[in-house]
Amino acid sequence: MEQQQERPREVYRECMRNHAAKLGTYANDGCCEYTPDDGHPAGLLCAACGCHRNFHRKDFLDGRATAAAGGAGGAGVGVAPMLPAPGGGGPPGYMHMAAMGGAVGGGGGVDGGGGSGGRRRTRTKFTEEQKARMLRFAERLGWRMPKREPGRAPGDDEVARFCREIGVNRQVFKVWMHNHKAGGGGGGGGSGGPGAGGGAQTSSSTTRGGGDVGVGLSPAMGGDGEDDEEVRGSEMCM
């Protein structure tokens, strides 16, 4: 009489529960294998992640199941290789951190992020006194950022002192001056030359209805060593 074949033993691998389904993305909890909870043997809950056993990927410890799952059919008893989580490579824990950090906004929880996924650019608002003083100072400079004087320490030139007086960052003042030298702030018409060449040096300029201006500067604008780099991510309120 032939010996009755044993039933393949079932094992439960990584948790496949999607904790970010409401956000329209995929994020698991990083649990790599189902661990029975000895305190609730009949509940079938995982002691590691707290999810029901049905959320974990089921596998069989026999050659046929291994061949079907991983394509490495063997005659003996084997374990199927761990499949990557849907949506990308890497172990489940890495997928969990990537999805929670990118899609949720890095808030450390599903409900803690803003959901936008993008970084908002900063916006600077000026008082009327600041705008008036910057306009007069820019006209006196000829609407062009001057070079630093040789031998002077950084932050000891005329522009740095002016920025400290009015409480404005040097780079912010540079962007504001570039935005207004073409005539937008009334200073380009009176200064002549710099106003005429403003269009050639502007790489992008967008004016919105609320008066916000986002601008990028070409490296040729300033003769200053530190101020020659391209300015990105700055917005001004008129």
UniProtKB/Swiss-Prot annotation:
Gene3D superfamilies: Homeodomain-like (1.10.10.60). Residues 183-238 are annotated as: Disordered. A zinc finger (ZF-HD dimerization-type) spans 12-59. GO terms for molecular function: DNA-binding transcription factor activity; transcription cis-regulatory region binding; zinc ion binding. It is found in: Nucleus. Residues 119-188 bind DNA. The homeodomain differs form the typical one by having namely 4 instead of 3 extra amino acids inserted in the loop between helix 1 and helix 2. This is Zinc-finger homeodomain protein 11. It comes from Oryza sativa subsp. indica (Rice). The lineage of its organism: Eukaryota, Viridiplantae, Streptophyta, Embryophyta, Tracheophyta.
